[in-house]
């Protein structure tokens, strides 16, 4: 909310694979993840997060690592995850987007299965002086998969 509440503090803004308010895609995803977390099924949760975040090409290379990933980093409990998921479920800044005054770059993935590509388009349509870039064929993890992601962001910020 910094760019909304204090626009003079922000010269340029990048919003990547995000949304301003709930949509059916994120509601469905979050409800599934919340159920897995409540059940304590870390393995199924991590696999579902990966399957919904990465492109098919990426997943083909890394699916064989699922058994290892499901054992690494398992939390003692899911309270932190549940708190973050609840915050995502109640977040709504849509009506305030017109208060963002600085040049803004919205980046999304055309195949985003978590927040949807439409969420990126919606953001870009509501923010004036906004540039939209959708990575074709990539999803929510576009920031990890696109080789030019960091350079694109840096070029915009410079």
Label the predicted regions.
Residues 121-122, 151:
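Active-site phosphate/pyrophosphate- and oxyanion-stabilizing loops and adjacent acidic/basic residues
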Residues 24-26, 44-96:
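Conserved alpha/beta-hydrolase catalytic His-Asp/Glu region
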Residues 135-150:
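Catalytic histidine-centered segment of alpha/beta-hydrolase-like enzymes
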Residues 100, 106-108, 112:
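Short beta-strand/loop motif that positions the catalytic acidic residue
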Residues 1-5, 9-39:
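Flexible "cap/lid" loop of the alpha/beta hydrolase fold
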Residues 152-158:
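C-terminal alpha-helix
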């Amino acid at each position: 909310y910094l760019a909304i509440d204090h626009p003079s503090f922000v010269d340029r803004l990048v919003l990547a694979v995000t949304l301003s308010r709930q949509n059916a895609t994120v509601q469905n995803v979050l409800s599934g993840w919340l159920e897995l977390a409540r059940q304590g099924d870390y393995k199924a949760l991590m696999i579902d997060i990966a399957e919904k975040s990465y492109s098919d090409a990426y997943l083909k290379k890394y699916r064989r690592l699922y058994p290892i990933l499901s054992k690494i980093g398992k939390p003692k409990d899911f309270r932190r995850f549940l708190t973050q998921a609840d915050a995502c479920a109640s977040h709504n800044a849509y009506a305030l987007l017109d208060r963002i005054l600085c040049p803004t770059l919205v980046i999304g993935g055309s195949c985003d299965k978590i927040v949807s590509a439409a969420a990126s388009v919606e953001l870009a349509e509501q923010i004036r002086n906004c540039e939209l870039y959708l990575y074709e064929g990539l999803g929510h993890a576009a920031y990890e998969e696109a080789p030019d992601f960091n350079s694109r962001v840096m070029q915009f910020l410079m």
